Amino acid sequence: MLAILDYKAGNQTSVRRALDHLGIPCVITADPEVIQGAAGVIFPGVGAAGQAMNELVTTGLDEVLRRQVQAGRPLLGICVGCQIMLDYSQENDTKALGIIPGECRLFNPAWTDEDGAPIRVPHMGWNHIVQRRPCELLKGIEPEAEFYFVHSYYPAPPEEYVIATCTYGAEFCAIHGGPGLWAVQFHPEKSGRPGLRLLANFHRYCTEAADAQ
């Protein structure tokens, strides 16, 4: 079973619908015992980084997530969840979880697209990613696959944590982390077949990791 973290800055219902479609057992929960007993945790997020961190700290879920990582249990951050897994976000001058090194930065409105026009912020719509290193999440997903993005800020971890990039005015990190600890800037639950495959890959990894214990 996968646990979807329940706090006031997430799009938990959309994630659950995607997992239900795949036939993957899941529960939306803020219960630390349920989270600890899950094969893996999905950490979605929408809205502002500061608000999301406030909710996590107020409920104590920030420490629950840190313990999840310290115990080596799989975690997948989505959108704002992806951003606040880093040390810091420029949005609201937010001290974040510090699970993965790096910071989250605002898109530069002076950047231009391939036609020379200034980019619009937020980055909203479908875009393809470029895989930079092997990743279990991307197994079986075509290189030309597109994912759905909605964000004004982008993650900027150290190069060794960058798994895939996307280009919007400039190249930015679209997936970061490492085995069992991943963060995706796009919304897999809204990305059609490629997004569903990514979620299925995460579940498979979690199941295999749990069976190996």
Curated annotation (Swiss-Prot):
This is Imidazole glycerol phosphate synthase subunit HisH. Its EC number is 4.3.2.10, 3.5.1.2. InterPro entries: Class_I_gatase-like, GATASE, Imidazole-glycPsynth_HisH. Pathway: Amino-acid biosynthesis; L-histidine biosynthesis; L-histidine from 5-phospho-alpha-D-ribose 1-diphosphate: step 5/9. One of its GO terms (molecular function) is imidazoleglycerol-phosphate synthase activity. One of its GO terms (biological process) is L-histidine biosynthetic process. The gene is hisH. Pfam families: GATase. The lineage of its organism: Bacteria, Pseudomonadati, Thermodesulfobacteriota, Desulfovibrionia, Desulfovibrionales. IGPS catalyzes the conversion of PRFAR and glutamine to IGP, AICAR and glutamate. The HisH subunit catalyzes the hydrolysis of glutamine to glutamate and ammonia as part of the synthesis of IGP and AICAR. The resulting ammonia molecule is channeled to the active site of HisF.
